[in-house]
UniProtKB/Swiss-Prot annotation:
Protein family (similarity comment): Belongs to the peptidase M24B family.
Underlying gene: AMPP
EC number: 3.4.11.9
Binding site for Mn(2+) 1: D422, E520, E534
Organism for this UniProt entry: Sordaria macrospora (strain ATCC MYA-333 / DSM 997 / K(L3346) / K-hell)
Protein name: Probable Xaa-Pro aminopeptidase P
Catalytic reaction list: Release of any N-terminal amino acid, including proline, that is linked to proline, even from a dipeptide or tripeptide
Signal peptide, first to last residue: none
Residue numbers binding Mn(2+) 2: D411, D422, E534
Highest taxon, organism lineage: Eukaryota
EC primary class: hydrolase
Amino acid sequence: MTVNTTDRLAALRSLMKERSVDIYVVPSEDSHASEYITDCDARRTFISGFSGSAGTAVVTLDKAALATDGRYFNQASKQLDENWHLLKTGLQDVPTWQEWTADESAGGKTVGIDPTLISPAVAEKLNGDIKKHGGSGLKAVTENLVDLVWGESRPPRPSEPVFLLGAKYAGKGAAEKLTDLRKELEKKKAAAFVVSMLDEIAWLFNLRGNDITYNPVFFSYAIVTKDSATLYVDESKLTDEVKQYLAENGTEIKPYTDLFKDTEVLANAAKSTSESEKPTKYLVSNKASWALKLALGGEKHVDEVRSPIGDAKAIKNETELEGMRKCHIRDGAALIKYFAWLEDQLVNKKAKLNEVEAADQLEKFRSEQSDFVGLSFDTISSTGPNGAIIHYKPERGACSVIDPNAIYLCDSGAQFYDGTTDVTRTLHFGQPTAAEKKSYTLVLKGNIALDTAVFPKGTSGFALDALARQFLWKYGLDYRHGTGHGVGSFLNVHEGPIGIGTRKAYIDVPLAPGNVLSIEPGYYEDGNYGIRIENLAIVREVKTEHQFGDKPYLGFEHITMVPYCRKLIDESLLTQEEKDWLNKSNEEIRKNMAGYFDGDQLTTDWLLRETSPF
């Protein structure tokens, strides 16, 4: 649905003129660099009408541009009104939003941004680019201008309860995690680490919340020094159990709004050191805000680092890994029941079900499983051409009826107390064409190739990406998204710093035993269909005949327990090794589903058919 943004842009431009700003940048993120945000922080969506999770809006006094990546080209072209120009990031000869902004700044123009919504590295590079192109520079505008346009209709900030995640699920206490973090401070000779990422704070203190839909996090900051820890959070959200737990771990509670006041105290303390002493250094994540770096005293006193908390969080302990395995079995049972039910509804009962009605039923089946908390993201329930919109979101009351004679793509996930799931399966309830079967099988071959890969410790996801694409590449085909992302343990479904893809950030982060990430190659034909096959996998050490360079070798243990669509597989394109892999995988699924469908003949028959040997 397209939103008319004419009045909103006019109001924003009026505020820009009042503040001597010629160009205003509106990022997607909140002040914690969250990928998924709460409604009151959806500023880019409000000003542009584009609701995808990634993108940046740039507004001049007479133009407006929205930059997003290949996952959202289709969606953005449908949602943006005539006021906006779409910058298709990654395509040849298309400028990035930074390049477009710098070009527009020529002639001494000032570019403004809310400094809490941009990292120091991006801000500093943008400032340099603006000046190179003849602009006056990047200005920190402390009042968010979109918030002022939004006014009283802006949703309130959530204040959901915060609860303790016990050792049964976390596997490691907050006191031990704080000790490990302090060792990192000592190594880096830093006085404190100011924590701004919400999932890092939740993990560090073994707490969870519900301030951002689908993400069990809560609005907070933290400061950890060698002998103290302070959690900045609205205290009314904390139960007595949480307060006691924090006290036992030596953590002081302060209001969320006190963070910047206390960073000024730290900055003043750092400035008071004598010239003969080494300057006091504070650590922040390389995803922390420009505002936070400025508040701590700027370049002299702040080191931006890949967060040691993020690195530790990405390597799950044995309790977390076992939880991930178990919740994927329960999640698999819900999905298998759903796909059997959906086929029966569409084929046997000739029911007319729309995409949202189907997704609601999947959520119902998931909610029947133990330790279920909620979904981990909006279910992508997509029929036919909607599947080609990579992050499609069916709208209640305005979505398509599922066509049994078209490809159906379902990308969904859940939050359980013992883990987070994310799985995509592509199905056909009628008779697929030879071209559809070929496309599906090429994607499946890529999934198998990556799942069975063995690689030396120290290998990054950047280096592995081509394994999943190679079969598509042989036919001149590809997909415009990463092949894999890290996944949290009852935390965010997208978790850094690891991933599989061509992002430069992945080059410097090797995969390590205990990582959990997705393997999800795909193929999309605009206006026709989308195919994606996604499993979650644990990185683990594997035994090899040799260990060149005395390095251990790693591989994947896939934990998703859902079969692949039998009728979409072209067996003639599979090698015997790939058939053996499928047979082993299907046998494992059957074994893990024992007892889940007793008395449910419909689901049992579907499972036996879809997992029959090749």
